[in-house]
Amino acid sequence: MMSRTPDARARDTQTKQIQENITSVEKHFGDLCQLFAAYVRKTARLRDKADLLVKEINVYADTETPNLKCGLKNFADQLAKVQDYRQAEVERLEVKVIEPLKAYGNIVKTKREDLKQTQSARNREAKQMQQLERMRQRNPSDRQIISQAESELQRATMDATRTTRQLEETIDDFEKQKIRDIKKVLGEFVTVEMAFHAKALEIYTTAYQHIQNVDEEGDLEVFRNSLHPPDYQSRLEIVRANSKLSLNRTGTSMSKSGTMQSRTSSRQRKRDDEEDEEEDDEDEDDLEEVTDDEH
C-alpha cells in the first residue's frame, strides 16, 4: 500500500490542531458563559434580597421616633436606588457578556462543519490514492484505467487543497474574532461593573450621611417625653398643688387653733379677774356693815 505523502501528513497534523483549537474554544467559552450566567443570577438574587431589606427598613421606620424615622426612610430610598442600578447591571451583563459568549455555541458548530467538509475532502483524496495504488499493482499495463484513476486522484487532491485553504482562512478569521470577542466581552464586563460600583459608591455615601445625620438628642427627648405624657404631667402638678394646699391649710388650722386657745385663756383670765374683783367688793361691803354696827 502506498504510504501517505508528507503533504498529506502535514495536513492531518494541521487538521488535528484546528480540531483541538475549536474544542478548546467550545469548552472554555461554554464554561465562561455558564459562570457569567451564574454571576448574573447571583446578582439578581442579591437585588431581590436588597429589595426585601428596603421594605423591612421602611416598616421599621414607621415605628420609630421622628428623626430616626426620617433617617431610615432616606436610607431605604438610597438603598432602593442602588437596586435600580443593580437591575441595570444585570440587564447589561446579559446583553454585553452572556449573549456574545452564548453565540459561540453556533460559531463553533459552524467551524466544526467546515472542518468536517475539509476532512471529507481529504478522506476522498486518500481513498483515490489507495485506489490508484491498487490498480497499479493489479493492472500495471492498463494505462487507461490507471490514467483515469490518476485523474480522479488529481481532482480529489485539488478539492482537498481547496477546502484546506478555505479552512485555513476561516480558522484564521475564527482565531482573530475569538481574540477580539474575548477582549470585548471581558472589557464590557469590567465597564458595566465599574459603572455600577461607581454609582453605588455615590449613593451609598448619601445613604451613610442620611443615617449619620439623625438627631439622637432630639429623638431621646421625644422618647423621654413619651414616657411622661402631658396628661401625666398635669396630674402630677395637680397632686403637688393639692399637697401644698393641704399643708397650707394644716398650718392655718394650727395657727387658728393657737389663736383661739389664746383668746380662750384671755377670756378665762378676764373672768377670773372679774370674780376676784367681785369677791373684794363683797369683803369691803361686809367690813362696812360691821363698822356701822359697832357705832
Swiss-Prot record:
<dbReference type="GO" id="GO:0036064">
    <property type="term" value="C:ciliary basal body"/>
</dbReference>
<feature type="compositionally biased region" description="Acidic residues">
    <location>
        <begin position="273"/>
        <end position="295"/>
    </location>
</feature>
<dbReference type="GO" id="GO:0005814">
    <property type="term" value="C:centriole"/>
</dbReference>
<keyword id="KW-0472">Membrane</keyword>
<dbReference type="InterPro" id="IPR035590">
    <property type="entry name" value="BAR_CBAR1/2"/>
</dbReference>
<dbReference type="InterPro" id="IPR027267">
    <property type="entry name" value="AH/BAR_dom_sf"/>
</dbReference>
<keyword id="KW-0496">Mitochondrion</keyword>
<keyword id="KW-0175">Coiled coil</keyword>
<dbReference type="GO" id="GO:0007007">
    <property type="term" value="P:inner mitochondrial membrane organization"/>
</dbReference>
<dbReference type="GO" id="GO:0097227">
    <property type="term" value="C:sperm annulus"/>
</dbReference>
<keyword id="KW-0963">Cytoplasm</keyword>
<dbReference type="InterPro" id="IPR009602">
    <property type="entry name" value="CBAR/FAM92"/>
</dbReference>
<feature type="region of interest" description="BAR-like">
    <location>
        <begin position="12"/>
        <end position="222"/>
    </location>
</feature>
<protein>
    <recommendedName>
        <fullName>CBY1-interacting BAR domain-containing protein 1</fullName>
    </recommendedName>
</protein>
<feature type="transit peptide" description="Mitochondrion">
    <location>
        <begin position="1"/>
        <end position="49"/>
    </location>
</feature>
<keyword id="KW-0744">Spermatogenesis</keyword>
<dbReference type="GO" id="GO:0097546">
    <property type="term" value="C:ciliary base"/>
</dbReference>
<dbReference type="GO" id="GO:0060271">
    <property type="term" value="P:cilium assembly"/>
</dbReference>
<dbReference type="GO" id="GO:0005634">
    <property type="term" value="C:nucleus"/>
</dbReference>
<feature type="compositionally biased region" description="Polar residues">
    <location>
        <begin position="243"/>
        <end position="265"/>
    </location>
</feature>
<comment type="similarity">
    <text>Belongs to the CIBAR family.</text>
</comment>
<dbReference type="GO" id="GO:0035869">
    <property type="term" value="C:ciliary transition zone"/>
</dbReference>
<keyword id="KW-0221">Differentiation</keyword>
<dbReference type="GO" id="GO:0005929">
    <property type="term" value="C:cilium"/>
</dbReference>
<dbReference type="GO" id="GO:0005743">
    <property type="term" value="C:mitochondrial inner membrane"/>
</dbReference>
<dbReference type="GO" id="GO:0045880">
    <property type="term" value="P:positive regulation of smoothened signaling pathway"/>
</dbReference>
<keyword id="KW-0999">Mitochondrion inner membrane</keyword>
<keyword id="KW-0970">Cilium biogenesis/degradation</keyword>
<keyword id="KW-0966">Cell projection</keyword>
<feature type="region of interest" description="Disordered">
    <location>
        <begin position="243"/>
        <end position="295"/>
    </location>
</feature>
<dbReference type="Pfam" id="PF06730">
    <property type="entry name" value="FAM92"/>
</dbReference>
<dbReference type="GO" id="GO:0007283">
    <property type="term" value="P:spermatogenesis"/>
</dbReference>
<keyword id="KW-0809">Transit peptide</keyword>
<keyword id="KW-0206">Cytoskeleton</keyword>
<feature type="coiled-coil region">
    <location>
        <begin position="111"/>
        <end position="185"/>
    </location>
</feature>
<keyword id="KW-0282">Flagellum</keyword>
<keyword id="KW-0539">Nucleus</keyword>
<comment type="function">
    <text>Plays a critical role in regulating mitochondrial ultrastructure and function by maintaining the integrity of mitochondrial morphology, particularly the organization of cristae. Plays a crucial role in ciliogenesis. Plays a key role in the correct positioning of the annulus, a septin-based ring structure in the sperm flagellum, serving both as a physical barrier and a membrane diffusion barrier that separates the midpiece (MP) from the principal piece (PP).</text>
</comment>
<keyword id="KW-0969">Cilium</keyword>
<dbReference type="GO" id="GO:0005737">
    <property type="term" value="C:cytoplasm"/>
</dbReference>
